[in-house]
Amino acid sequence: MDDLKQKYLSQIAAAQDEAGLEAIRLAAVGKKGEVALKMRELGKMTPEERQVAGPALNALKDEINSALAAKKAGLADAALDARLRDEWLDVTLPARGRPRGTIHPVSQVTEEVTAIFGEMGFSVAEGPRIDTDWYNFDALNIPGHHPARAEMDTFYMTRAEGDDRPPHVLRTHTSPVQIRTMEAQGAPLRIICPGGVYRADYDQTHTPMFHQVEGLAIDKDISMANLKWVLEEFFAAFFEIDGIKTRFRASHFPFTEPSAEVDIQCSWIDGQLRIGEGDDWLEVLGSGMVHPKVLAAGGIDPDQWQGFAFGMGIDRIAMLKYGIPDLRAFFDSDLRWLRHYGFASLDQPTLHGGLSR
């Protein structure tokens, strides 16, 4: 019995793999193994012999099975160690790069404009893109015969046959937001109104849908001098040019009186626009003192309050600042264009941290 025990325990200890270990198990404790054959011989023994041999064989079988299990676990651990050595991963290596999206220039410039005017105390106001012609035209002192109300310039919403109510329009500017905010908040007031607007025009510098930001400030003693200061501060911060020169030219808008178009100093060198230098001028926005009729339409007494307003194209000033040649490309959804002109998602513009890259 001891010889049999030593034989198989030594074979188990010397086994190199699970296949060899299984062969030893079958030879030792399998149905036709040596221990099983010894068990069958118990029937030929006397009772006294069986009382001695039976427990010894069971103990041998248990010991061999324990040795087999321990060896199998050891082989599995060794195989795992070998696999880990062969397939190890250096966790200090940089991760594989993931495709990253970019912030559209319109979104970025909107955030830049909001940050600048936010430092001056302006809050953001928003309103519907589909509005009544009263908010879009009448409340802004734009009469029925004005060219802007023609179907060739404005997108009108059709009504069901027999519905005689005034038509809705896709707003042609964000000025209706000013009227709604005056109605809701009264005076004093200091807001900017960024958002999408719609006009029936399409060429290199015009698209049927584009983006505007308009500003409105109403108080007791506001004047054109305040308007001039606000716009010059904005241009200096937005274009990041100290002392940028501006020029106010008399103009006419139905909703402001007096009205002025505002130009900024620029030059053209080898076909490249340079802002803040040279002897040329570039128109960038319209502005003026809010017309008394517009204040009255917003529920504000023009004898007690006055204010200034201005408006500019977000897409246009984005083109000027970042050298984008064609407005239509803003809406083409071209990933190559977006990767080139887009901004990192964490580029949050602030006056103190920097507006642009």
From Swiss-Prot:
Compartment annotation: Cytoplasm
Subunit structure of this chain's protein: Tetramer of two alpha and two beta subunits.
Keyword 4Fe-4S found: no
Reported cofactor(s): Mg(2+)
Domain of life: Bacteria
Keywords in alphabetical order: Aminoacyl-tRNA synthetase, ATP-binding, Cytoplasm, Ligase, Magnesium, Metal-binding, Nucleotide-binding, Protein biosynthesis
Cited NCBIfam families: pheS (TIGR00468)
GO annotation terms (biological process): phenylalanyl-tRNA aminoacylation
Positions of Mg(2+) binding: 257
Catalysed transformations (reactions): tRNA(Phe) + L-phenylalanine + ATP = L-phenylalanyl-tRNA(Phe) + AMP + diphosphate + H(+)
Assigned GO CC terms: cytoplasm
Main location: cytoplasm
GO molecular function per UniProt: ATP binding; magnesium ion binding; phenylalanine-tRNA ligase activity; tRNA binding
Protein EC: 6.1.1.20
Similarity comment: family membership: Belongs to the class-II aminoacyl-tRNA synthetase family. Phe-tRNA synthetase alpha subunit type 1 subfamily.
Protein name: Phenylalanine--tRNA ligase alpha subunit
Cofactor binding comment, as recorded: Binds 2 magnesium ions per tetramer.
HAMAP family: Phe_tRNA_synth_alpha1
